[in-house]
Amino acid sequence: MQLNEAVSARLKELLRERNMTQYQLYMKSGVPKSSIGNIVNCAYDSVKLRVILEICQGLEINISEFFNSPYFDETNLEP
């Protein structure tokens, strides 16, 4: 799995757990809805850490909670 795919999968999982839409996340985080959509759809090769931090603030989690997922285990990520 590529890193952008892991970020996408984790974001989808967190949105689903919170019954939150991309629009609601945009309203809470300030990250443009188009950017959130591009992250979810793996349209970006990479995502700035600052954007992930803003998303985490909108999700009301800290950044370590975002990355605390099997998606980010070394064995699951391609080099």
Which stretches of residues belong to each language-model region?
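A short, Lys/Arg-rich alpha-helix, primarily the initiator
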Residues: 1-21
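Short, basic-rich loop-to-helix N-cap that marks the start of a DNA-contacting helix
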Residues: 43-54
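The alpha-helix within a helix-turn-helix
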Residues: 15, 26, 56
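Residue-level detection of the helix-turn-helix DNA-binding "recognition helix"
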Residues: 16, 30, 41, 71
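Short alpha-helical DNA-recognition segment
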Residues: 19-38
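Short, charged recognition helix plus adjacent turn
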Residues: 38, 67-79
